[in-house]
Amino acid sequence: MFVKINIEINMDEKLEKRLLTRNIKSTPMRVLVLQYLIQQNNAVSLQAIENAFRLADKSTLYRTLKTFEKNKLVHTIDDGSKKLKYALCLESCECEAIDQHYHFHCTMCQNTFCLTNQNVPKIELPKNFKMNQANLVIKGFCANCNR
């Protein structure tokens, strides 16, 4: 029993540290949402997060995600499903052009995955143009649906 409590305390400290490294004040709800996002193996919609935290105030969850996005803890993905998805950024991510990567959207199960090992190639833009975000989504069947 003591070991479990110690592990939970260490986990909370790690989550709080991850928030603080992004200049995000730690609150119980922010820690819970961060923990939830870490446990997911794919990007999730606001609706999925609301379903996971049914008793939480919806506006609090929305503001939490917007705070995470503003401080580069998560990035958003428009995968064409008409539901914006949220995924954790890598700890080293600064959401610059070099950090942009492809996403894979399964057209069967509707899950969206970050392909962080596939960076978007640098594109030469016209003079005085600056890329803020690239939305590159590959669609097909994920490993589970392709069986």
What are these regions (language model features)?
Residues 26-29, 40-45:
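Short capping segments at the starts of secondary-structure elements
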Residues 55-59:
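Short, basic interhelical loop/turn and adjoining N-cap
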